[in-house]
Curated annotation (Swiss-Prot):
The record marks D314 as: Transition state stabilizer. Binds starch not only at the active site, but also via accessory binding sites on the protein surface that are important for efficient binding to starch granules and thereby increase enzyme activity. Ca(2+) 2 binds at E130, T133, D135, D139. This is Alpha-amylase isozyme 2A. Its cofactor is Ca(2+). It comes from Oryza sativa subsp. japonica (Rice).
Length: 445
């Protein structure tokens, strides 16, 4: 049964229109956030108003539990939130409460594919797990490890249902106790005691979609449970991605289907769109259309289930595993913030790169014109140096080095946002309404 606070939260979200299908995610950390003097949660608390003002609906927070690695991605004592390098449990709860007070949902970074043990067994292998509570919750032994993870297991568990994670024991998610106790832990994170609303599933390649479905259905996250499924794209002999990436996006769509499809909260990060954009903005914008005239990523097939992004803590930040061309980052945001799908803004770009105002302006255009994850897309131009698209008949956007695309802009549209290599137009009626709102707001001061 929902508590009064939870019911109030749901009502607030409905009033803010978040139930309409439009989500603006914000990744609220990077790879180095754990180093923050005074704690990352406290720093982020001071930025809540800026995040709210930008139209964000969901903030993705780092893994909250004790971890062998400082960033949180090698978790051990899952119930121990005070051992996090990002701050204390009370600081986390205060941050989530502040977000809720502004109508923003909090996404927990859920790392359950693998887990680090506290103690060695009689073989001298680290495979005795401590849950972080005085009782026996999540206190596991080697029989909770997949038997094909021979470095750690005792050979009695089930086979792994997904990809191997070599650095830590792969947990046996077919074990009933594992499923029940991890579900209970997630429900605890979602309860009033902590307050998370939704999930980001780390390394979801490590366990089957059917396993993910167990946790999603067992915890009913509010609005989304977005999976990280980062697989290699198809590359040509020139080292660039092949034009056709249908197999890559099909794997992402298949995962959504297998966790429950439309009826499920399951979603995926659109790594297909990310990979194509990385190359397209370097003078190959013809890549941004598929053979059917649609967007070439997951947003071209199932946009409601796609979370689009420019960079994250892995691809960008200090890891730089797959970075977006740094001089064209705003072209990436002009694309994802005007197109179908559920866009995610990266902390670094918003706060550290000085792009806050430009990104917020694009979000404002999106929200002012009612662009959502399922908006219609008409691609008007896809040349090497220019890409132009119309969204819902209300917004037109352009990215690329070509300056003049005026012949493609329909009559009755007004320039709403622009910067290096991008421009966005909206119908004059929307622009006038926005101006009237600003005028009336100023008059009331």
């Amino acid at each position: 049964m929902a508590t009064g606070r939870r019911l109030s939260m749901i009502l607030l979200l409905l009033l803010l229109g978040l139930a309409s299908g439009d989500k603006i995610l914000f990744q609220g950390f990077n790879w180095e956030s754990w180093r923050q003097s005074g704690g990352w949660y406290n720093l982020l608390m001071g930025k809540v108003d800026d995040i709210v003002a930008a139209g964000v609906t969901h903030v993705w927070l780092p893994p909250p539990s004790h971890s062998v690695s400082t960033q949180g991605y090698m978790p051990g004592r899952l119930y121990d939130l005070d051992a996090s390098r990002y701050g204390t449990s009370m600081e986390l709860k205060s941050l989530i409460s502040a977000l809720h007070g502004k109508g923003i949902q909090a996404i927990a970074d859920v790392v359950i594919n693998h887990r680090c043990a506290d103690y060695k067994d009689s073989r001298g292998i680290y495979c005795i797990f401590e849950g972080g509570t005085p009782d026996g919750r999540l206190d596991w032994g080697p029989h909770m490890i997949c038997r094909d993870d021979t470095q750690f297991s005792d050979g009695t568990g089930n086979l792994d249902t997904g990809a191997d994670f070599a650095a830590a024991p792969d947990i046996d998610h077919l074990n009933g106790v594992v499923q029940r106790e991890l579900t209970d832990w997630l429900l605890w994170l979602k309860s009033d005691e902590v307050g998370f609303d939704a999930w980001r599933l780390d390394f979801a390649r490590g366990y089957s979609p059917e396993v993910a479905k167990v946790y999603i259905e067992g915890t009913t996250p509010v609005g989304l449970a977005v999976a990280e499924l980062w697989d290699s794209m198809a590359y040509g002999g020139d080292g660039k991605p092949e034009y056709n990436q249908d197999a890559h996006r099909q794997a992402l769509v298949d995962w959504v289907d297998r966790v429950g499809g439309t009826a499920s909260a399951g979603m995926v990060f659109d790594f297909t769109t990310k990979g194509i954009m990385n190359t397209a903005v370097e003078g190959e914008l013809w890549r941004l259309i598929d053979q059917q005239g649609k967007a070439p990523g997951v947003i071209g097939w199932w946009p409601a289930k796609a979370v689009t992004f420019v960079d994250n803590h892995d691809t960008g930040s200090t890891q730089q595993m797959w970075p977006f061309p740094s001089d064209k980052v705003m072209q990436g945001y002009a694309y994802i913030l005007t197109h179908p799908g559920n866009p995610c803004i990266f902390y670094d770009h918003f706060f550290d790169w000085g792009l806050k105002e430009q990104i917020a302006a694009l979000v404002a255009v999106r929200q002012r014109n009612g662009v959502t994850a399922t908006s219609s897309l008409k691609i008007m131009l896809h040349d090497a140096d220019a890409y132009v698209a119309e969204i819902d008949g209300k917004v037109v956007m352009k990215i690329g080095s070509r300056y003049d695309v005026s012949s493609l802009i329909p009559p009755g549209f007004h320039l709403a946002a622009h910067g290096n290599g991008y421009a966005v137009w909206e119908k004059i009626a929307a622009a006038a309404a926005a101006a009237d709102h600003r005028t009336s707001s100023s008059a009331s001061l």
